[in-house]
Regions:
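Glycine-rich phosphate/diphosphate-binding loop of Rossmann-like nucleotide-binding domains
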Residues: 1-49
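Short, small-residue-enriched loops and turns at beta-alpha junctions
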Residues: 8-11, 55, 95
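Short amphipathic alpha-helical segments
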Residues: 15, 59-62, 100-102
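Short, glycine/acidic-enriched loop or turn micro-motifs at the edges of active sites
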Residues: 39, 53, 93
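Short, well-ordered coil/turn residues at beta-beta hairpins
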Residues: 49-50, 91
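Glycine/threonine-rich flexible loop motifs
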Residues: 51-72
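Rossmann-fold NAD(P)-binding glycine/threonine-rich loop
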Residues: 69-117, 121-130
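Surface-exposed, charge/polar-rich loops and edge strands
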Residues: 135
Length: 139
């Protein structure tokens, strides 16, 4: 797993990265944190991003995030660095033009809608399991 993030306050905490690397090593994997999105995307089979803005962010917070993260936006140019059969993922909702370009999220490599559908199925299965299938009509 390769993580692309600006240095400083945006970077994951070193103890979290170390713990993740311990877990990854058990399966032959590793976690790598890079500050260059192009290096991180090169040869990737999947690109996953999330929304940058949170509800309640002040205008100053929004400006700071855009300034720090704009070079990490997923664009068609960035996707060209990935493998031929790579996919783009996003947990939604997405802000087109911020963390992802419209042509990427709506493009042929995007699996965000399939991802959202499977999330619904997963949640339904989890709820069924947690209620032991004892909801009305399922006894």
């Amino acid at each position: 797993v390769v993580v692309a993030t600006p240095a400083g306050k945006w970077a994951p905490k070193s103890d979290v990265v170390n713990q993740a690397n311990e877990i990854a090593r058990k399966s032959g994997g590793k976690i790598e944190v890079l500050t260059d999105p192009k290096s991180a995307a090169k040869g990737a089979s999947a690109i996953y991003t999330d929304v940058w803005m949170s509800m309640g962010d002040s205008e100053a917070d929004r400006t700071e995030k855009i300034n720090a993260l704009s070079s990490f936006a997923v664009t068609s140019e960035l996707m060209k660095l990935t493998t031929k059969d790579s996919i783009f993922m996003h947990c939604l909702p997405a802000h087109r033009g911020e963390e992802v370009a419209a042509d990427v999220i709506d493009g042929e490599k995007s699996v965000v809608w399939r991802q959202a559908f499977h999330r619904r199925t997963t949640i339904q299965s989890l709820l069924y399991h947690l209620t032991r299938g004892e909801l009305k009509g399922n006894k």
